[in-house]
Amino acid sequence: MRNASKKHLDLPYRPGVGMMILNADNHIFVGKRIDTKISAWQMPQGGIVPGETPSIAAMREMLEEIGSDKGYIIAESKCWYSYDLPSFLIPKLWNGNFRGQKQRWFLIRFTGNNEDININTSNPEFDQWRWASLNELLSIIIPFKRKLYQAVVKEFDSLIQ
């Protein structure tokens, strides 16, 4: 891995979930990360609390990150997807205990309105949000997550059309 040093490769992946949230027009929710100066757009994601199932974690994280849990799960990924953080980020996230995340992904149909979305939560992760087309998603996503996103899009593509 060009992003991770040998020491970092010995670290485990943090277990988590990712959510591809679709609106009625089959556009995908993306948020711009609040903790960076670069244009870092991503789909909502988060950790799994011990004892929590991935599907419960996905709906909890949806509420925590977009301020709404108005939606339902269409599909769960068949496998765990992982990504490695760039080396410079490892010491800054999760106390330096993880090299990246392994995630179970969920395709979720958002049943609310735009007014139901509130990214100004108690621990905000995004300072902007919008709906992106499937094609646009891969062009705006933060580069080190692009390969993972391509795999998730490939798996869920037939369910989005």
Curated annotation (Swiss-Prot):
GO terms for molecular function: mRNA 5'-diphosphatase activity. Residues 12-154 form the Nudix hydrolase domain. The keyword NADP does not apply. It holds the Pfam family NUDIX. Its cofactor is a divalent metal cation. InterPro entries: NUDIX_hydrolase-like_dom_sf, NUDIX_hydrolase_CS, NUDIX_hydrolase_dom, RppH. The keyword Nucleotide-binding does not apply. Keywords: Hydrolase. NCBIfam families: PRK00714.1-3, PRK00714.1-5. Accelerates the degradation of transcripts by removing pyrophosphate from the 5'-end of triphosphorylated RNA, leading to a more labile monophosphorylated state that can stimulate subsequent ribonuclease cleavage. Belongs to the Nudix hydrolase family. RppH subfamily. This is RNA pyrophosphohydrolase. It comes from Rickettsia canadensis (strain McKiel).
